[in-house]
Amino acid sequence: MYFLRQLNCGRRYIGTHKKNKIEQIMLWKITQNFLTTIVILYTGLHWGICAAPGVYLFLNIFQNTANYSNFERAMLIGVSIGVGYVLWMLSTIFLTSILSFILKPSIGSVRVPFLSITSIRWGFLNVLDRLAKPCIHHMVPSWVTDFYYRSLGCTIGKGSFVSSDRINDPYLVSIGENTVIGSKVIITPHLAEKNELVFAPIKIGNNCLVGLGAQINPGCEIGDGAVIASRAIVPKYTTVPAGEVWGGIPAKLIKKK
């Protein structure tokens, strides 16, 4: 009888545990769908506000060129559309920079549950970053994108050259002096693991070269003077010693300088 009572208690515990887990999943899905809807609506608002300077320029030129010849009017309106597009990109970058600067979290190496305030805050920052990404793509490398990354907390040393629009979570990335980050390099200081978001800062030293399309994963440290070959994937929590050349998938030592 004692055994049967214990067995029934065990079954009730398992049933309750499964029920709680299902409820947590449902709560997460409801929260996710609600926040996604808010984000979709906000996207239109964000891009719409940033489009206002370009639209204002277009309307002024359109209204003030009514008496011009068709050729002159077409040229001026065409220029207003082109300049308006550039104004939209710059406005998007600067508005996103301001909001991200205000909202960026002060975190280091940490694990947080998917359903947490930190995760939601990180998700919204990710959305802001994605709104700016199409504009960053057309602006790298330039002082504009350096300003953007720095305003989001990224450390970029003197004389460094950042040519990638794929630096995620910039507030967890540190780039030393006289370092070159090639085009399409992916730098990602976070990953999803066991129902948690894992954040691990990435540090790239001085006088480094990260080649075209390479990927640097969470927790990596690239020593001074190191070279990461094009298309290489550096596994998470890897330390590349100073002065070494790494390449391949996964990246391994090729040679020492």
Show the residue positions of the predicted features.
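Glycine-rich hexapeptide-repeat left-handed beta-helix
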Residues: Y2-R5, C9, S183-H190, K194-K257
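Terminal amphipathic alpha-helical/low-complexity segments used for targeting or macromolecular assembly
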Residues: M1-R150, K257
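Glutamate identity and glutamate-enriched acidic tracts
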Residues: E23, E72, D129, E177, ...
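A short alpha-helix capping/helix-coil boundary motif
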Residues: G123-L125, T155, I202
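Left-handed beta-helix
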Residues: A132-T188, K194-N195, A200, A214, ...
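Residue-level marker of positions within ordered structural domains that often coincide
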Residues: S100, D165, A251
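Flexible domain-boundary/linker segments
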Residues: G108, V112, D165, E177, ...
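Glycine-centered flexibility motif
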Residues: S97, S106-V110, G153, G182, ...
